[in-house]
Amino acid sequence: MANFVLPPIHDNSDGSWGPSTSTLPAQFKDIPYAPFSKSDKITRIADWHDPQAEAAAGTRTARTVQSGGRRTAYGAAEGTVFGFVHDEDEKSFSLVDSGVRVGARGKAPIRGRSVRGVASARGARGRGGQRGGFSTRGGRGGARGGYGDWNKPQRTRDSSVTIGPEWEVLEEIDFNRLSKLSLSVEDPEDLASYGTVQAYDKTFDRINTRNEKPLEIVNRVRYNPSTSDDPIISQYAEKKEAQIFATDSILAVLMCAGRSVNSWDIIIEHRNGQVFFDKRESGPLDYITVNENAADPPVDSDDVSNINSAGSLSLEATYISHNFSSQVSANSKSKAYTPNPNPFYSPEVESEPPASTLYKYRKFDLSIDEEEQFSVILRTEADAYLGKKEVLVTVKALNEYDPRVQGGSGKPLDWRKNLDTQKGAILASEMKNNSAKFARWAIQSILAGVEQMKMGYISRANPRDAQRHTIVGVQSFKPLDFARQMNVSLANGWGIVRTIADLVLKQPEGKFVLVKDPNNPLVRLYKVPDDTFEAGAEEEEEEQDEE
């Protein structure tokens, strides 16, 4: 039987770690230390079986084949640890990984063209944001911008209002909480109607791409005063007719808050046990957004001549909507319907006639139980009547500013060429890019109790000219069906209104501001001083008096 003799153990005389270099065996001299891998099994003397390497043998990538299956430990590979380059200066040498990195052959370079046609990496669209996920067109390595913009910096938007240092945050509600609110409301009570409304010209329904009609500039005055500036609402408030007072445009923004991307603000006043929802003059609620929910929405620009900036497009959309709603009823030969005079129009002051608008004041019951008395009075609007005076319609306008860049992540469709044959695809694209705007229009029409929504497709006569436009089509919708198609929940909107009103009523009387965060899906309720926003209004009044 063979005997096993233990080799001698040489202790280090100076007490340091490891054997002394003087006692190192001759066969191990001049061999540098090689690092080992963390996955090495050091509990056995020898183990030639590596199940991980065998499992990965059939699924090796080009990079593992190139490196010979070498495992990396502590940032260095075992097979390449000696692959250093001998330099003239021995003191400056270092161990480097000499493995050649295999690039993705055939991958298209990311250039400026990725801005158009390739969706930006925005959080709302997920990684890449491109329709269909990671596109691998062109075979191997042909990723055409699918995730090339993953590290693209996200856009930082500005708040619609400057948050003052004296503003106190009372509540912060994210959209996830808002989406869970619900309150069923019965049919409203019609209180009164004011203004003059004219008949809708049915010839506009026959407009198509082969029978276009230019958009005319109609000199009509359209009023949209805030809640507190409405004399009719002031009368109802004095009589304690309701607990909440607002307009349909203000309440629609609040009820569709979960779809908002841009920042907005609503002024809320609590006085005499009542809540008033107001808007700032010339604030974001007075203008129509364009492609707010698109993957690559328009951006603000300091260049005043840029007609495709977010601000310029919003102003253009508001201008188009005003003229289109006036044009469809301006040449009507039917008799105008005036239940009561327009409360905002004064012939002594205005030289132009008022636009066709019927202001309907309606009362909605927001009570939770039978014993509670909690209601809201709204001022709603209708733009024309259809055939009979009782059949009211609202008129809205969609604007096409540049078909080459307006198509979003999909293929752009020129309205003048494709509206008649692909109206469904164009409408679906507009619903996707303008989800917040469409939802607000649907809510406003439902609150007003109109029978139809008339939506006009307005295109620029020349993509480089924002002054001349052409009507290329008109489409009709029933508000309730349109809301279902947009997945708009009226019960959820009423739940949001009741929740915000309850939060304000729990606070002492004063002024509050509800602000949608510009970069996060949430709203904040601020307690602000009573003189907030009044200094600017007084300055504007002084300037008007001087003029």
UniProtKB/Swiss-Prot annotation:
Region ranges (Disordered): 1-22, 114-159
Main localisation: cytoplasm
Localization per record: Cytoplasm
SS bond list: none
The keyword Protein biosynthesis is assigned to this record: yes
GO molecular function per UniProt: mRNA cap binding; translation initiation factor activity
Entry domain remark: The RNA gate region regulates mRNA cap recognition to prevent promiscuous mRNA-binding before assembly of eif3d into the full eukaryotic translation initiation factor 3 (eIF-3) complex.
Subunit structure: Component of the eukaryotic translation initiation factor 3 (eIF-3) complex.
Family: Belongs to the eIF-3 subunit D family.
Name this polypeptide is given: Eukaryotic translation initiation factor 3 subunit D
Organism listed in the record: Cryptococcus neoformans var. neoformans serotype D (strain JEC21 / ATCC MYA-565) (Filobasidiella neoformans)
